[in-house]
A protein has these predicted regions:
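Catalytic beta-strand/loop cores that center a nucleophilic Ser/Cys/Thr
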Residues: 34-82
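Short active-site-adjacent structural elements
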Residues: 19, 59-63, 96-98
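Feature representing long, continuous alpha-helical segments
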Residues: 6-9, 74-75, 102
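Cysteine-nucleophile active-site neighborhood
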Residues: 1-37
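Acyltransferase
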Residues: 84-119
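Conserved active-site and cofactor/substrate-binding residues in soluble primary-metabolism enzymes
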Residues: 3, 48, 95, 99
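Hydrophobic, well-ordered secondary-structure elements that form the walls
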Residues: 8-11, 53, 91
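Hydrophobic alpha-helical scaffolding
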Residues: 16-19, 43, 90, 94
């Protein structure tokens, strides 16, 4: 409790353990309007289903996506989009948006080809 550990340094935030589950359950994720960084893997208006279940939170959970509970009006910003990656707590259900999965794989292939050109 209260300890922090250095990680990869990709996200400038601190994750910490909480006493209870936070943002638990099924959600729908959609891209926030201003997230041009993620448009190569995702298009706004085509949400992905996901779920969260964790005893951790972050000093900055990100703002690339808007997470919404399926029932009710509860929503929050989450996740980061950077260099073709989407990073955050939600676990994505790819079958809910096959185009998202397809674009993710396209991005992986493009990154591989980019690395091969350099070496």
């Amino acid at each position: 409790e209260g300890k922090t550990y250095p990680m990869a340094g990709v996200i400038n935030a601190v994750a910490y353990r909480t006493e209870k589950l936070g943002r638990f359950g099924y959600i729908t994720l959609d891209l926030n309007e201003e997230q041009a960084e993620a448009r190569n893997i995702w298009q706004q208006g085509f949400p992905v289903r996901a779920h969260e279940f964790h005893y951790f939170d972050s000093t900055d959970p990100g703002s690339a996506c808007l997470a919404k509970k399926p029932a009710g009006k509860r929503s929050w910003s989450c996740s980061y989009a950077k260099d073709g990656s989407l990073m955050g707590f939600p676990h994505l259900y790819y079958y809910s948006n096959p185009m998202f999965a397809f674009r993710f794989l396209e991005n992986c292939m493009a990154k591989k080809l980019e690395r091969e050109k350099v070496s």
